[in-house]
Amino acid sequence: MKKIWKRVCTGLLALTTILTALPTTSVYAAETQYWTESSERVGYIEHVMNDGTIHSTFNEGHMKVEGETAYCVDINTGFKNGYKTRHDASASMSTAQIEDVALSLEYVKQYRGSHSNLNANQGYLLEQCVVWQRLSEYLGWQCDNVRAAYSEISQDIQNEVYAGARAFVQANKGRYKCGGYIYTGEGQDIGQFWAELNVGNAKVKKTTANEIVTN
């Protein structure tokens, strides 16, 4: 019996020695990477500064994350196709900022739905511009009136949309659940935002550029 026990102890000691000699590998949870791209050019943007000067004019691309629409959230940085890491927008934006951007986008989407004269590219340009306008006000870019070139979308339509978006935000704060994601990596960050009508708020306050109408 003593011989058997001795053999068992010797075997366990040998196994422990082998395991100790093996290299230790730390296991980390890999961060999910999302493919981001500027899939096509949709039209020209005029980077208008608050003093009225045009800082630059450029042909804007349609930003996408895994094929889904997204928006540039840093007008001062060039975009590069590639993989980016997704973060909840609340990690870098306040609740008020997220709500402002999300509701502005919601207004433009509703406007597009009722104005068939706008094509898909024009609609995207308007959405991208309201994102930049809201972020410029919060982040001090000094380009609160960035716009699509008037050759892309008329001044009258743009004025109506931008004024309407501001009115819609003021009329509907607290009526929607708003959120978003920011994708970071090499080059320009991009974002996605949404606004979902809260349960119990079935009546949405719609707006025009001049007045607020409640159904």
Where do the protein language model's features map onto the residues?
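C-terminal segment of classical bacterial N-terminal signal peptides
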Residues: 5-10, 18-27
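Short, surface-exposed polybasic-aromatic patches that bind anionic ligands, especially phosphate groups
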Residues: 30-208, 213
